[in-house]
Amino acid sequence: MQSRRPVMLVILDGWGWREDPADNAVLQAKTPTFDALWTNGPHAFLRTSGKSVGLPNGQMGNSEVGHLNIGAGRVVMQDLPRISDAIANGEIERAPGLVAFIDKLKASGGTCHLMGLVSPGGVHSLQDHACALAKILAKAGVKTVLHAFTDGRDTPPKSAVDDIVRLRAELPPNVPIATVSGRYYAMDRDNRWERVSKAYGVIADADGPRFADANAVIADGYAAGVNDEFIVPAVIGDYQGMRDGDGVLCFNFRADRVREILAALLDSAFAGFPRKQVKQIAAAAGMTQYSTALDALMGTIFPPQSLVNGLGQVVADAGLHQLRMAETEKYPHVTYFLNGGEEVPYPGEDRIMVPSPKVATYDLQPEMSAPELGDKAVAAIESGKYDLIVLNFANPDMVGHTGSLPAAIKAVETVDTQLGHIVAAIRKAGGALLVTADHGNCEMMRDPETGGPHTAHTTNPVPVLLVGDNGPLADGQLSDLAPTLLKLMELPQPAEMTGKSLIG
């Protein structure tokens, strides 16, 4: 006899809905579990982009935004429009974090090393934000250089040349591009220090291949068959590296992929790889809060918003037990982001992280660690210990980002198999299960405009399925999931949660 009725949310990361089967890994894959749930049980669609998740109209969602909205149970105004609005109305110039950064650099006389993802993608950054900061720094008389990370993941794989041309046109003439690094190197998040060290080398020590300008770096990469994401870090012109008294300003607003490079640049105790000489940094700031560890080393221009009474807090306050599960790639999303930016687990909250496979790109192993994660999920359900389980399967998103349709099909099929095991365990335990996604990706594997691989997220709706309750389900948005889970758990919905239960 189960001591607790488990209620579970399974997030099929990157599993969007598109009716056309062409270049659609979701529809081309064999998915008997999903198909049976869709045919025989309550189902609906959720909006995961634009204003439905606190982003600008037409802006695709992403995992960070998605999990924030899921956990908060309300539409969370995202950093992208929040920052853009502050730039448009001039408020950013008065932001205490930026004012303090500029004052420190003026006092030290050092150079500002402005860095981040040069991309119109709007997932990790917006290059317009970089240009706005560069103009503010130039106006303040602070010498500034820019370290450009190229995208090709949230944007078409060969779009960096156009991005750099637009960047140069907007940057003040006295702000040069000092280095160029593909995000594969500069924005790792899985402790692959052999990659990060190459980006660090060009930024800190000007140690790497040298080119006359940024476009020459990209052209050299293309000639070698290397797309934007994988551009080998390079030095531009006569850049000589960082010096004592310099400052670091990161314009990415998403936290997870800047933590490693910033730790290497700022943390005197960093041990990921040997550094030639640790520079004495006079000032450091980030567009948003990146982590508790980095808080001790840098300021924040846009501090986090308070998100009280989210899903995790409500469950904990009721004295219930919850479990968060994912492999490495999506572990921060089911913990930190789902908890509204809180890193410390709530009382009664357990966490399981299964290591992601150590491969260069996930098309080489589209199964990733889903089988192990699925086994652990079944064991958790059968344990009778948990009232709420939240699990993320990373495969459809992470393999979708590679642009390989055959690999994405395999990823979807792998996840469907594991979902089958979970459904059986939930039914046996007398529990309830919601299955959905945080955004689309692998349902669109070819770019209709360029004809090339489509590696970015989409603005398509995502399916939502219900097991163990008769429903019916209404269409909605991600912020409606927490109220739905609370209803299944027979817990009251707090006033701060403005989402609506999907169950009629």
UniProtKB/Swiss-Prot annotation:
Catalytic activity: (2R)-2-phosphoglycerate = (2R)-3-phosphoglycerate
EC number: 5.4.2.12
Gene3D superfamilies in the record: Alkaline Phosphatase, subunit A, BPG-independent phosphoglycerate mutase, domain B
Cofactors named for this entry: Mn(2+)
Free-text comment on the cofactor: Binds 2 manganese ions per subunit.
Subunit (UniProt): Monomer.
Protein name (record): 2,3-bisphosphoglycerate-independent phosphoglycerate mutase
Gene name tied to this protein: gpmI
